[in-house]
């Protein structure tokens, strides 16, 4: 892994974006960036068990056509150092420290799943740091049933072992012909990066993340009425991991939000519908 000059990434596709490293309070954080310089960057916050290679290239490349995009491995994830904390608030604190280390004082946030929960922490703790948010496949802290995700994940991992498939075939997409086709297309896109791939998620990171999610599900709900940032909430209509009604509840509780629910799709609905989702995000981010 090498450290590259900041200007190297402007015209590079996500599959070719070099991995960089920055020291954040003594911990090396791995990240990649692409897209035009200037303006407010979009910082991507990854999902449960994800490393940078798990972002859909069509989503990042699509948004990077008009915005500078930054994706990173949070503390203890993938190529970043240290250990993953079993606490959503600490994950948010770590993400804030990373953003500050890059010298950014205003960002847009794109949080998917676990990343959406982390984005909410950031907006609550340092609201002046955030301009706009895209929250996909996620719900509010203290949402009923989110703490049951450990059982859902375990079931998917068992099915994956029996079928020799990635668990996300069962967690992200419905087991319909349309959903299976979308899953296969998604994994084909993830395989487009062939060089300089990230380190896989560790066992410690998996257990810490699921512990943080369960703890967050049992927590006292946050007062989201104070989060006044414009927010685009999106999900599929059959999300097994974060029930779609939690995304609807999130949108109701955020006073300046808009909601899109994609039909015949699950937790990965924004990837299944990337051709529709990306233009909607670009339109949302283009607003002042």
Predicted regions and their residues:
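Alpha/beta-hydrolase fold catalytic core
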Residues: 1-44, 65-67, 286-288
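Conserved HGGG/HGGXW glycine-rich cap/lid loop of the alpha/beta-hydrolase fold
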Residues: 27-81
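Active-site loop/oxyanion-hole signature of alpha/beta-hydrolase fold enzymes
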Residues: 70-110
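Flexible "cap/lid" loop of the alpha/beta hydrolase fold
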Residues: 124, 131-163
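Conserved alpha/beta-hydrolase catalytic His-Asp/Glu region
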Residues: 165-218, 222-223
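Short beta-strand/loop motif that positions the catalytic acidic residue
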Residues: 227, 233-235
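Acidic catalytic loop of the alpha/beta-hydrolase fold
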Residues: 238-242
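Catalytic active-site module of serine/aspartate enzymes centered on a nucleophile-bearing elbow/loop
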Residues: 257-288
């Amino acid at each position: 892994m090498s450290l590259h000059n900041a200007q190297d990434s402007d015209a590079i596709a996500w599959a070719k974006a070099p991995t960089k490293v920055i020291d954040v309070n003594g911990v090396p954080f791995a990240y990649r960036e692409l897209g035009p310089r200037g303006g407010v960057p979009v910082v991507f916050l990854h999902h449960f068990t994800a490393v940078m290679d798990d972002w859909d290239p069509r989503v990042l490349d699509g948004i990077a056509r008009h915005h500078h995009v930054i994706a990173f491995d949070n503390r203890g994830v993938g190529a970043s150092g240290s250990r993953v904390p079993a606490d959503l608030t600490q994950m948010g604190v770590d993400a804030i420290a990373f953003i500050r280390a890059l010298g950014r004082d205003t960002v847009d946030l794109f949080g998917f799943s676990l990343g959406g929960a982390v984005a909410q922490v950031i907006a609550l703790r340092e609201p002046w740091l955030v301009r706009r948010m895209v929250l996909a496949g996620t719900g509010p802290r203290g949402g009923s049933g989110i703490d049951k995700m450990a059982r859902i994940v375990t079931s998917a991992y068992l099915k994956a072992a029996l079928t020799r498939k990635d668990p996300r075939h069962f967690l992200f997409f419905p087991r319909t012909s349309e959903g299976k086709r979308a899953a296969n297309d998604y994994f084909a896109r993830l395989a487009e990066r062939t060089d300089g791939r990230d380190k896989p998620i560790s066992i410690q990171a998996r257990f810490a993340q699921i512990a943080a999610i369960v703890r967050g599900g049992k927590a006292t709900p946050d007062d989201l009425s104070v989060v006044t940032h414009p927010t685009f909430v999106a999900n599929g209509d059959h999300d097994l991991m974060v029930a779609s009604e939690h995304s609807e509840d999130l949108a109701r509780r955020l006073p300046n939000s808009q909601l899109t629910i994609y039909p015949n799709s699950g937790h990965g609905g924004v990837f299944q519908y990337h051709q529709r989702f990306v233009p909607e995000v670009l339109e949302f981010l283009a607003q002042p």
